[in-house]
């Protein structure tokens, strides 16, 4: 469920439109104007996605009735699905912003941070499974939390790379 929205925001039309616009501003108006545009877009998108995610997380049972109506017949399965979807939906906001930050860095010819960001997901998933190997009957909640944490970690990673490069001064 969160991956559907991630594809729309992080890999979909929004990012496809953002990168050429940012690159054109960078070329035509200069770094200052392009970065002001990027900072505004990131701030607006971050707030919008946070509010959207908050709404979806609150009303996740209703969404799950539409997405997985057969699960309602087994209370435990429906409850687990809602719980895991709520946790993993946290991933949407930071990973969508990661795509924008990566697009900014890529526009400057800086590819390393974005290319290495998915490694954080793998490391966090592996470490969480090793660390919590014997503490839970099912690994689903551990992996869901690890996915959410990895989204935040990737966002911090890319934000720091942008700051070191001088691509992001502040979020508006």
Range-by-range predicted roles:
Residues 1-172:
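Membrane-embedded alpha-helical bundles of multi-pass transporters/translocases
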